[in-house]
Amino acid sequence: MTPAPDQLVLRRPDDWHVHLRDDVMLEQVLPATARQFARAIVMPNLRPPVTTVDAAIAYRQRIEAALPDGMAFTPLMTAYLTDDISPDELERGHREGVFTAAKLYPANATTNSAAGVSDLACITAVLERMQAIDMPLLIHGEVTDPDIDIFDREAVFIERHLIPLRRQFPQLRVVFEHITTEQAAQFVVDGDPLMAATITPHHLHINRNAMFQGGLRSDFYCLPVAKRERHRLALRQAATSGDPSFFLGTDSAPHPRAGKESSCGCAGIYNAPYALESYLAVFEAEGALQHFEAFASENGPRFYKLPLNEDTITLKRTAQLVPAQLEGQGLVPFHASEVLDWRLAD
């Protein structure tokens, strides 16, 4: 038996789905993402949402201004699709290198998505243009019909919307973001090279029981919600399989502790500070360390047609206790009060 390594040196990873927020929260959470990742796809669901080239440029400038001295990090900006967004505005942003991709939020599916798309038919011209200019579409894949059980909303979205969309726009590059079900994983496996998916660390670690163990655990509440154990296991198999259609996307979504622990708690898990250590625990447990670099550092940029990072990071087998709360931030990190076996070296 090959002995377990004490150190891993990897091509620097990227995060293909992150919420950096804005203002004070941006300043608090950006260093954690920039420490672990060279680039990140930045979600546009601010208030107001990022729907124009000028808004994306301004947000990118705020991110760059908040970056601590000595840190190298590139934010990759996205456009927030609405029923009336202009195809010309999207094309201009993509041509000028401002918009890396466009994000489809079904209206009212998640945090700050009220201005999202009410019906895919409303954005047919937009999707036609995106397909023509080879601009990736990023999808929050859940239906919002109140008659559909919240645990079934991803699977129903595939049948109602994603399958027809792939048929109508077969040359459109699509990322099915933060997948949570075996149906989603299988849909991507069965798809073509223009279909990919991101997987979060928390959906690899927890199932829906975690939200209710020992009481109501608001820190494990996110959207899409965690599902049954069989879905978690299917995600672990997909992430660690070596299939290039799957890549890292944390969906790190910080909320102040007071916002999480309230009568109407916010959806989102803040996993950025220990994201790589969290993913690595899964790959090691599944006996798939040989596939970790591709998942974290190679599959994403290849799908987005971006260069691979040339610098490296080092992860060492050094146990670390994750704090119950991050000092001075009022944020509870994923794995709070747990011990992780790996540590990202400074």
UniProtKB/Swiss-Prot annotation:
Binding site for substrate: 19-21, 45, 140, 223, 255, 267
Record field: catalytic activity: (S)-dihydroorotate + H2O = N-carbamoyl-L-aspartate + H(+)
GO terms for MF: dihydroorotase activity; zinc ion binding
Residues given in the record as Zn(2+) 1 binding sites: 17, 19, 103, 251
Alphabetic keyword roster: Hydrolase, Metal-binding, Pyrimidine biosynthesis, Zinc
Any Gene Ontology biological process: 'de novo' pyrimidine nucleobase biosynthetic process
Cofactor binding remark: Binds 2 Zn(2+) ions per subunit.
Binding site for Zn(2+) 2: 103, 140, 178
CDD domains named among the record's database cross-references: DHOase
Pfam families: Amidohydro_1
Oligomer status and interactors: Homodimer.
Family statement drawn from the similarity comment of this UniProt entry: Belongs to the metallo-dependent hydrolases superfamily. DHOase family. Class II DHOase subfamily.
Protein name, as recorded: Dihydroorotase
Organism (species): Synechococcus sp. (strain RCC307)
Gene from which the chain derives: pyrC
